[in-house]
Amino acid sequence: MSEEVQSDVKRFLDRLDERVAERLAAQGTEPSWIAARRQAGAARFEALGFPHRRIEEWKYTDVRAIARGDFRLATDADFSPATAARLTLPVEAHRLTFVDGVFAPALSRLDDLPGGVQLVPLSRALEENHEAVGGPLGRLTGVEFSPFAALNTAFMEEGAVLRLAPGTVVEKPIILQFLSRAGEAPVMSHPRILLEMAGRSQATVIEHHVGEEQAANFTNLVEEIILDRGAILTHYKLQEAPLGDLHVASIHIEQARDSRYTSFNLNLGGGLVRNDLVAELNGQGAETHFNGLFYGQGRQHVDNHTLVNHNAPHTFSHENYKGILDDRAHGVFNGKVIVKRDSQKIEAEQSNANLLLSDRAEIDTKPELEIYADDVKCAHGATTGQLDEEAVFALRTRGIDAQTARGLLTLAFAGEVLEQVDLDAIAERVELAVAGKLPERFNLAGLVETAAALNEE
């Protein structure tokens, strides 16, 4: 490890020492298992350092903007209520809100939770019954997974815990909102999310990352999702962070028999974004659906790595990721499916399609299949291209000008993912965001109206 890298690592570990000292001075000792895991995370991070491009899984993503950053840790959750209202999704929901990683009770809504649902900030869950949290926390995403997972474990202090009792059906969505502030100095946060759904429970969770336009912070999230037999979860991750923000997320899902997990990974913001999404299909009848849409412009960098492990027979996975890249944006997609030995009668389908709106935009895509069973149905594919000029011409013959035609085709490309979204507020928000990012700067209302009229014909 070079002296420069050692210096970067030391700067983060110094921040950790400062934070631990502050916490101990304010609260006294912490449970021994928390201290042990924190130390393990710090030791692993110190040994690994930040990932570099000589590592295969990071060969297209440069994290020096994170490594060289001098990030502080937030100590309060002050945020303009008016700004928060403007940024919040217009969805009737239960909501936990965090500002730069600090729980914001004034911006949360927990007063009408139904029976069978526990939704609390991680800090409160640890205070009330830390032993109940200690078992599952870190079981799926340990310090060995990546340097960022180790760093998150070292700094672990806040996040969300969501537990559903057997047979519980939550009618309203649950929103986990993460707000990023524009301050005098950049800050970092390391939220930890633990979601446990007992048998036959059902919920929709919206994870929303958004913030003030001039914010330039670092979010390093770890999320562990455990679905018991027959549990059903729809998980929206809407990432609209400011372009100055840096965002890393590690999400692990463990699925028991007959459970179903549906993910919508929607990335519109952030200057540097890395998502790792891993599903473990451990019981027969388990289903995983990965849907993704990312839009990059300027010099945005968006990297999506997905992994589905078919660990049991009669399991099913479907993946559809689409990327739209403009200017000098860079996208990365690495989707991997592993079919374990004796996992017969599985079905796995994977697709990645990318649309380049600029000659300088770049995509690196790598779909992978590893199959160690012989009675399976598997398919994968990736395509990259520009808008179909024949389709543009066809729209122009209907009286639509060239710029609007290109905008409509781009929206249609995104729409193949968005039409699967059941929540209109999210689908419409993403659709308008995509239209607003298009290079021609269309009249948004007119463009959407034209698209709607064509759909009705």
How does the language model describe each region?
Residues S2-A150, N320:
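N-terminal amphipathic, basic helical "cap/leader" segment at the start of enzyme domains
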Residues V5, Q118, L122, E128-I400, ...:
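Conserved beta-strand/loop scaffold segments within soluble protein domains that form the structured core
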